[in-house]
């Protein structure tokens, strides 16, 4: 089974008090089956840049972590192609869904993956298989 993880999932273990269910999900899941999107890397990079504006050292630490994520997932980073963009366009007609969340749903659908996210409500109507590790 393959999973596409949202930014909130990849970020959870880094929190001062990460959710035990999320940590357990990561331990139980074959890492080779976990993928991230270029969108997630973009959101993480944005987070590092925002952190650097407040505290340069914290921003560098955050960016170092983002670089480690990018290296660790090197072969498991999914881009946005024409098929994903077209499906996203179709999914966006039914109702307004946050762009990144709906692009992640389209990516997971095209690749036959389960989307792992806490934002279940945002993608519930897309038809994507969803797993919320906070509730597993």
Predicted regions located by residue number:
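Acidic, PIN/NYN-like endoribonuclease modules and their adjacent C-terminal/linker elements
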Residues: 1, 105, 109-136
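Short secondary-structure boundary/capping segments
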Residues: 1, 25-28, 68-69, 77, ...
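Short, well-structured N-terminal submotif of metal-dependent ribonuclease cores
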Residues: 1-36, 50-66, 136
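A generic structural signal for short hydrophobic patches within well-formed alpha-helices
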Residues: 10, 41-44, 85, 123
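Residues that scaffold the ATP/ADP-binding catalytic core of kinase and kinase-like folds
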Residues: 12-13, 25, 47, 87-91, ...
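Short, conserved active-site loop motifs that form the nucleotide-linked donor/cofactor pocket
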Residues: 34, 75, 128
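Residues at the C-termini of beta-strands that transition into short coil/loop
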Residues: 38-39, 81, 119, 134
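Active-site neighborhoods of divalent-metal-dependent phosphate/nucleic-acid chemistry enzymes
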Residues: 46-49, 60, 71-118
């Amino acid at each position: 089974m393959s999973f596409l993880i949202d930014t909130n999932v990849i970020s959870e273990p880094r929190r001062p008090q990460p959710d035990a269910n999320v940590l357990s999900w990561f331990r139980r899941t074959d890492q080779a089956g976990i993928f991230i999107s270029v969108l997630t890397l973009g959101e993480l990079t944005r987070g590092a840049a925002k952190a650097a504006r407040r505290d340069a050292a914290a921003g560098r630490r955050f960016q170092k972590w983002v670089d480690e994520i990018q290296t660790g997932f090197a072969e498991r980073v999914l881009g946005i192609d024409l098929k994903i963009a077209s499906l996203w366009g179709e999914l966006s007609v039914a109702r307004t869904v946050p762009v990144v969340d709906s692009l992640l749903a389209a990516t997971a659908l095209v690749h036959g993956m389960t989307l792992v996210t806490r934002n279940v409500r945002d993608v519930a109507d897309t038809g994507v298989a969803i797993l919320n590790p906070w509730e597993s």
